[in-house]
Amino acid sequence: MKASQFFISTLKEAPADAEIVSHQLMMRAGMIKKLGAGIYSYMPMGLRVIRKVEAIVREEMNRAGAVEMTMPVIQPAEFWQETGRFEKMGPELLRIKDRHGRDFVVQPTSEEVITDVMRQDIKSYKQLPKNLYQIQTKFRDERRPRFGLMRGREFTMKDAYSFDRDQASAKASYQIMAQAYRRIFDRFGLTYRAVAADSGAIGGDLSEEFQVIAATGEDAIVYCPGSDYAANMEKAEALPPQCDRKAASQAMVKTATPDKATCADVAQLLGIPLETTVKSLVLATDQTDEAGKIIKTQIWLLLLRGDHDMNEVKVGKVPGLAGFRFATLPEIEEHFGCKPGYLGPLNLQKPVKLVVDREVAALSDWVCGANEIDFHITGVNWGRDLAEPELVADLRNVVAGNPSPDGKGVLAIERGIEVGHVFYLGTKYSQAMNATFLDENGKPQFLEMGCYGIGITRLPAAAIEQNHDERGIIWPDAIAPFTVVICPISPDRFADVKAAADKLYGELLAAGVDVILDDRGERPGAMFADWELIGVPHRVTIGDRGLKEGQLEYQHRRDAASSKVDAATALDFLKGKLAL
């Protein structure tokens, strides 16, 4: 490709609404153009990156035995109503009506449609296993779309779905896909981790996220440097303390703490470690009738150490707390006789259900709210001042330095961007939609399913978050819009420069290299700035002075300076750099 034929449109400054590096650089490099909130046009330079991502994904999906298809973007609501997701998904699911008043959705994912396809066609165990995938446009009506392609409303996703006869074969299919994902991300040339994850609303009990490591990542990734253990923050287990609880050494005392409504403030006032304070979190669960009317509400009190944060996913798995909400102020005052900031498990106005974090269950001589404004209670002990807790659970986020659940060291935490996710679904969707097959005995069985997603348009943004500097993007070779750029200096003035550039360009094309020749006639400074911003990994500069010495200049995008290369062997040199 020659630059004069291509569409190159760079900006010196990023738009004001571009908040993160990838959004800023993709806009400045002319890779995307904003059309509306969370909706972008993929410009030629950006589309080349996306197509390379798609090609790698497609090759590895095919290699893993998956078969490509395409499902509709607009889907009849009746399939989503079968699984209950038409109501459950909330406003993120874009619902529309046609001219006849019939309900449709704009797909955010396609479990319902693929399950309908398979229940029509799969009749016998002899037709299994099957694995189908698509690379297709999706839409989620994000409340606050931001960060460019990182959190857009319209995006491209690869979603695959496996179908098996039983759990064992379904989990084997899951492992085949998980290995395919590792090959995909290895080929992208990105630093990533595959981490154990919670399946969330999509269902199932086996799940991994593929996270691109980046300091700006939204997700906390928990791992053990001494082993292969890795999980996201929602999934990572905080083990119980290994030592026995110490005996009580303090009397329980009601202590004045005027205007000290946080554990940190109380600890500072009393001159005690923050980890000896206990925070009280009040939740509620509602029981409803068939019409959705609340007929009974249960109030819950959760106790966590003052230096720990509640993990909402873990809390939601405590028996009875599925679908919890935070209690309202009137509910809190009714049960505790006090506003938040001074709450505790003693002197309640009405009974509540108590759930205690593992760390709090091991505390002695701890501090909590007195259920009275401006007062806390010090020296609280289990068994003496409060009955031993009946319900103890892991309620918190782990912190760096906690023991690893695999017993092979301590945990560390880094940031990541989720770009892929694999799930074993089981029969969640096949049961809801009555998707069955006949086994060897002629008896109907529900299809065992897995689903596997990769954010095709999110991945380039994640790659930029991991690979950039003050000059612009630094693409890995595998997904760069072009692998090599040739920059001739003043080719209109120096025929030998133009000839050398054309010759090398032709040789690289013949060798199958994705090369672009910048024949726009730009000044060297402007030309170099463009390609550093765009992030092409290999740059060859051809100038008249260097040619007279038999040399070209080569610079990798990560290098601070260029190096001299013998013009006669430049092609072989570049082939070596490109591992051709």
UniProtKB/Swiss-Prot annotation:
Principal localisation: cytoplasm
GO BP annotations, alphabetical order: prolyl-tRNA aminoacylation
InterPro entries listed in its UniProt record:
aa-tRNA-synt_IIb, aa-tRNA-synth_II, aa-tRNA-synth_II/BPL/LPL, Anticodon-bd, Anticodon-bd_dom_sf, Pro-tRNA-ligase_IIa, Pro-tRNA-synth_IIa_bac-type, Pro-tRNA-Synthase_IIa_type1
**One Pfam family in the UniProt entry:** tRNA-synt_2b
> What molecular function terms (GO) are annotated for this protein?
aminoacyl-tRNA deacylase activity; ATP binding; proline-tRNA ligase activity
Question: Per UniProt, which keywords does this protein have?
Answer: Aminoacyl-tRNA synthetase, ATP-binding, Cytoplasm, Ligase, Nucleotide-binding, Protein biosynthesis
Here the disulfide bonds are: none
Q: What is its EC number?
A: 6.1.1.15
Catalytic activity, reaction form: tRNA(Pro) + L-proline + ATP = L-prolyl-tRNA(Pro) + AMP + diphosphate
Alphabetical GO CC annotations of the entry are: cytosol
Localization annotation? Cytoplasm
The organism's place on the tree of life at top rank: Bacteria
The annotated subunit structure for this chain is: Homodimer.
- Domain free text: Consists of three domains: the N-terminal catalytic domain, the editing domain and the C-terminal anticodon-binding domain.
Similarity section? Belongs to the class-II aminoacyl-tRNA synthetase family. ProS type 1 subfamily.
Q: What does this protein do?
A: Catalyzes the attachment of proline to tRNA(Pro) in a two-step reaction: proline is first activated by ATP to form Pro-AMP and then transferred to the acceptor end of tRNA(Pro). As ProRS can inadvertently accommodate and process non-cognate amino acids such as alanine and cysteine, to avoid such errors it has two additional distinct editing activities against alanine. One activity is designated as 'pretransfer' editing and involves the tRNA(Pro)-independent hydrolysis of activated Ala-AMP.
Q: What is this protein called?
A: Proline--tRNA ligase
